[in-house]
Structures are given as C-alpha cells and as structure tokens.
From Swiss-Prot:
Pfam families: Apidaecin. Belongs to the apidaecin family. The keyword Signal applies. The lineage of its organism: Eukaryota, Metazoa, Ecdysozoa, Arthropoda, Hexapoda. Residues 19-283 are annotated as: Disordered. It is found in: Secreted. This is Apidaecins type 73.
Length: 283
C-alpha cells in the first residue's frame, strides 16, 4: 500500500516539474500555400461567363465594328432622334454616312413679336432663318414721335401722326401762334389763375396783352402784431402795402426808458413817463 502511494507521488512530481525548458512557448508556424491556377477537375468553383447586356439608353457610345469576337461589350448602334426644338442646328447635308448624328432640317418659324428684325430679301436659299416682315403697329401713346412723311417705303417703322392733347395743367407754356402747321405740339393758351395767397406780387398795369400772367392786386391786410412798422403817410397810391398806424403800448417793466418830452408829433412811439420806484434794499 505504501509502495503504490509512493508511485503516485513520483508520477505527480514528474508531471508537474518535469518541464525544464525555461524559454517562453512559441507560436506554431503556418504553412503558406501558393495559389493553384491550374485547379484540378475536382475544384467546385464553376467557370462563369456572363451574358452580354446592352448599355444604358442615355449612354451614346460609338459603334465598334472592329471589336474582337471575344469582347463581351456588345456593338450598340442607337436609334437617331431629332434634336431639341429649341436647338436650331444648321443642316449637315455633307455629313458622312458613318456619323450617327441625324441630319435634321427644322421647320422655319416666325421670330418673337418683340424682336423687330429687318427683312433680308437677299438671304441665300440654304439659310433656314425665315424672311420675316413684321406688321406695323402704332407706337406707345406716351411716345410722342414726329411724323416721318419722307420715310422710305422699305422702312418698317410706321408713319404715325399722334393726336394733339393739351399739356398738363401744371405746365404753363407760352402760346406759339407762329408755329408751323407740321408741328404736332398744340397751341395751348392756359386760363389765367390768381397766384397763391402767400405770394404778394406787385401789380403790373403796364403788362402787355399777350402776357398770360394775370394782373393781380391783392387786398391789403394788416401786418403781424409783432411787426412794428413806421407809418408811411407819403406812400404812393400804387403801393399795395397798407398804411398801418399801430396803437401805442407801454414798454416792458424791465425796460427803463427816459421820457422824451421833445418828441415830434409825427413819431408814433408814445411818450412814456414811468412811475418812480424805490431802489433795491441792498444798494
């Protein structure tokens, strides 16, 4: 029994402490095998040849008639289509047959009504720009053009004689009795009107009859109370400034004027004798 126990102890010691290599364990090496392009018939990866498909319809590729038979890009010849109506391309009658751009001759159309082009009677027959002679139309009412009676027949600007109209009421033009008959500016004699009340104009009795500024004699009015004007008894009758004699008023209490007993009777400044007052207590 002791002998069996000793065998077990020796076996355990040898199993635990028997590794005498002090170096750390290394990673096992992996074998790197090269690819085998010549796969044996037992390889289960099939050889796949995709079916050719046409390219996208919006991709316009040129035909490749010399493509080798082993090329899987198909030979695609797109159908010709007319260009956009807004693209006015000149016809290419000498285009080579191998060119896949179609020969397109667009129908002529008249230009925009706002585009006034001169007629081109000498245009060559191969030019697809039509010869367009626009219909004459009267100009805008606000455009006062002079009539062109001597305009040549080939000029497409119409001869327009506008109707005369009176000018704006705020535009005071002088009458033109000597205007020539071919002038389309009417002879306008405005009605006289009185000037603004705040405009004090002197009367013009000698104004000529042809002057359209009326002779206006304003009514006299008294001046402002704060305007102390001296009386003008010798004013001429034609002067429209009225003769105004203001009423005398006492001066300001703080204004100590000395009395002037020798003042002339024609002076309209009153003779004022202030009442005496006692002096200041601090003086």
């Amino acid at each position: 029994k002791n002998f069996a126990l000793a065998i077990l102890v020796v076996t355990f010691v040898v199993a635990v402490f028997g590794n005498t290599n002090l170096d750390p364990p290394t990673r096992p090496t992996r074998l790197r095998r090269e690819a085998k392009p010549e796969a044996e018939p037992g390889n289960n990866r099939p050889v796949y040849i995709p079916q050719p498909r046409p390219p996208h319809p919006r991709l316009r590729r040129e035909a490749e008639p010399e493509a080798e038979p082993g090329n899987n890009r198909p030979v695609y010849i797109p159908q010709p289509r007319p260009p956009h109506p807004r693209l006015r391309r000149e016809a290419e009658l000498e285009a080579e047959p191998g060119n896949n751009r179609p020969v397109y001759i667009s129908q002529p159309r008249p230009p925009h009504p706002r585009l006034r082009r001169e007629a081109e009677p000498e245009a060559e027959p191969g030019n697809n720009r039509p010869v367009y002679i626009p219909q004459p139309r009267p100009p805008h009412p606000r455009l006062r053009r002079e009539a062109e009676l001597e305009a040549e027949p080939g000029n497409n600007r119409p001869v327009y004689i506008s109707q005369p109209r009176p000018p704006h009421p705020r535009l005071r033009r002088e009458a033109e009795p000597e205007a020539e008959p071919g002038n389309n500016r009417p002879v306008y004699i405005p009605q006289p009107r009185p000037p603004h009340p705040r405009l004090r104009r002197e009367a013009e009795p000698e104004a000529e009859p042809g002057n359209n500024r009326p002779v206006y004699i304003p009514q006299p009015r008294p001046p402002h109370p704060r305007l102390r004007r001296e009386a003008e008894p010798e004013a001429e009758p034609g002067n429209n400034r009225p003769v105004y004699i203001p009423q005398p008023r006492p001066p300001h209490p703080r204004l100590r004027r000395e009395a002037k007993p020798e003042a002339k009777p024609g002076n309209n400044r009153p003779v004022y004798i202030p009442q005496p007052r006692p002096p200041h207590p601090r003086i």
